[in-house]
Each structure stands twice: as structure tokens, then as C-alpha cells.
């Protein structure tokens, strides 16, 4: 999941617009299958033969005066229905979309920005072979040593961050084949890079602050959408204080019931425990209503994975991101602290989609 599972649903409106102008045969996209293992470093890069893809980094930062901040950087690549053999440089074969957000309790609400462009002309791209995505002056680049460099010059803030791995990538699901529903095609290729060490600077109101912290990066690509009865999803990526990492998600139906779920807990030695759909439960503990959209979000969430109980508490209530100018979605994406069985355990991010209105798949 992450920017969880089928963000393709958010892009359907854009894709339908571009496909409506096409008279040639639409391209045939690759399908996700369980028999294809992830291969690094190739799979750090883009996969243009699949319909949709995203790179998603979130984390907690700390300023020199110990002030906590949360950050989100997401780049989407989405293939249109244009004929791939069309030689025109102006044919919009791929769209690049980016979101960035800063969660600062001193501001009292989420600061966020978004961009959209068709790939091409060196202004927007997602390259194959290694992570290198760009949209105007926004970029996320992975070096051969695994370090990521992010530069985001947003409307209300600037991020200049390095994200350095401390662990190997964490393939989700069955070796990177991540089920999102009961049907085998309801799946994505998906891996995470938890426990990234972060250093750099954040600029607010023209003033730069040094920051350090810990981040989580997800990379996911797919072609098929979710179950047609799906309305949204809840997802969490948690860096635990002992070096472990927890990923959990559920897909919700239009009536609110769980359609699918999965969780994975990797300890610091690399051993992974997977949890089946019936072993994962998301239970809202407290809600917050947006004064802008009137959407109500379960911003404090309890997650059960097997015998363990995780309590997620938001850094601040107002972490709603309105991306109707790019992906068409309104969602809640927030920094959270985490307790495990009543004890302080870590920090991470919680994503809540489909609460403003059900996703149109």
C-alpha cells in the first residue's frame, strides 16, 4: 500500500482525460505476478510498462531546539492511454505528480504543496535503473551507495535532505508481491526502506534550520486497481526505537468493513513476521473533523497485529492534504507517535484515504 496501494484510483480522472484524445490502440501494460522477484538495483528505478508507480518518503525531524517536525515527499508516475508508438514529444505518455508536506505543531495545520506535469523536455521524468525522479525544481535521487537526496522548494517551505539507509530494503508481501485483495491481480510490487537516517535543512519564513531524524521510504508499482467495492484504505509505516519496522494496512469497503489487510514486522536482525488479513485490525480511538472539507478522520488509531496492540497518536490533528489540483484526492497523512502494548515504541506515519468521499475506481 503506501501512498498506499492503489493511488491509481486517484489518477483515473486525469487518465480518462488523456485517453479520450487517443485514437490509436492503447498500450498494453505489464501485470503484477507472484513469480517475479524484486531485483536490485534495477527495481529502485522506474517501471514505465506498469500503469502507476510512486516513491513515498515520510519521517520525523528534530530542530536544534528539539522541536519535532514531520515531513512527506511523494512522487507519482502514471502512464496514460496514449499510443506508446506515437513519436511526438508532446504526446503525454507519462504524467509526473508530486506532493510535499510539512507538519509543524507550531503552525497548527499541515503545510503542503503539489505539482503536476507530463514527462519530457528534461523538466519532469522518472528514470529507470535507479531512483531519479524530477518535477521542475523538485527531485529525489538515489546514489549508488544507497543515499537519497531530496530537494523540494515548495510554496511555504523548502526541504534539502539526505536519507541514508541503515538496513537492507524490506520487500513487502511475498518477496515484494503485495496482495491488495482476494484476487491475484489485485496486487502490486512493493518494498520499503525503513530506519533511514535523515540530515539536512528545512527553510520556513526565509529561515533555515538544521534538522536530523528518521524516515521511511516506500516504492510501489502496479497496473490493476483495487476491489471495485473498496472505498479507501488505512496504512501505517512505523520506525520502532529498537530498530524494528512495522508496516500495516487495511482496505475498507464502502460500508466501512475490512475487505483486505496485511501487516509485516521486521526485527533489527532482519527476521520478518507476516500477519494475515484476519490477524490485522484497525480500530479508531478518536476522530477529528476538518474545518475545510468537513471530512472526519480517525486520527488516533489502534492497530492489532496478532497478539500485539499498537496505539498511534498524531503529532497534531490537522494533517489533511487537499490534492484536488493534482490527483483529485483529499486525504489525511500524518506524523504519529506509537506505543506497543502500553509502552513507548517508536514514531511513524499514518495515512487515511476515502474519508472525504469514497474512491472512484
Give the residues covered by each predicted segment:
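Bacterial N-terminal signal peptides
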Residues: 8-21
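Structured soluble/peripheral alpha/beta segments that form catalytic or ligand/cofactor-binding pockets
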Residues: 25-361
